[in-house]
Amino acid sequence: MEKTVIGVVHLLPLPGSPEHTDLSAVIDKAVKDARAIEEGGADALILENYGDKPFLKEVGKETVAAMTVIACEVKRDVSIGLGINVLRNDAVAALAIAKAVNADFVRVNQLFFTSVSPEGILEGKAGEVMRYKKLVDCRAMIFADIAVKHAVHFASLEDYCLNAERSLADAVILTGKTTGGEVSLEELKYAKKTLKMPVLAGSGVNAENAARILKWCDGVIVGTYIKRGGLVDAERVRRIVRAAKG
């Protein structure tokens, strides 16, 4: 089975966030990064409001509007799959954007169970999320993090895996403890053996470890490694793709 490679477009600060300066600059960089991800041969990309530190658990209308505009511009420019992640945990906002731009998937950091993060308590709201998805007839798949990075978890990996299918997620994502931190191979192995749905590695993947990681999952989401000097580098994307697909 061919493995999936998803590149991350880390957006510059958006309107309403403390460090925002110029929306046109955000759009320009997002489009350039998206082009590089496509040029490098990745299967899809995901837009993430990574510059909006410190994050809100649920974002304002200005963030939804800005990300929708950016997603439209990116979708006009590239033809690979498109995903949306609204940090820190706004799945409804992500689905609203995905519906508007016909995105292929959304990422949800805490779809079920509860964790403690720097932004406060992240409460899983799978029931609300899935009902909203039905309400707006959004066809985007939902990729749910389990034991997501930058958070303290009280549920075990076993608990997450036992309850993943009840959340109606289409796939799950495992990460390391921090952005760029390598995911545990033992945790990947356990999830892959336990779950029937696709399992993705969501952090710490590089050209050197990609093949090893992909033995135990169905795809990778790569953000930190593919950047050089703050911009996505198509050659670094190619290295990941070669490692993933041979």
UniProtKB/Swiss-Prot annotation:
<comment type="similarity">
    <text>Belongs to the BtpA family.</text>
</comment>
<dbReference type="InterPro" id="IPR011060">
    <property type="entry name" value="RibuloseP-bd_barrel"/>
</dbReference>
<dbReference type="Pfam" id="PF03437">
    <property type="entry name" value="BtpA"/>
</dbReference>
<dbReference type="InterPro" id="IPR005137">
    <property type="entry name" value="BtpA"/>
</dbReference>
<dbReference type="InterPro" id="IPR013785">
    <property type="entry name" value="Aldolase_TIM"/>
</dbReference>
<protein>
    <recommendedName>
        <fullName>Uncharacterized protein AF_0419</fullName>
    </recommendedName>
</protein>
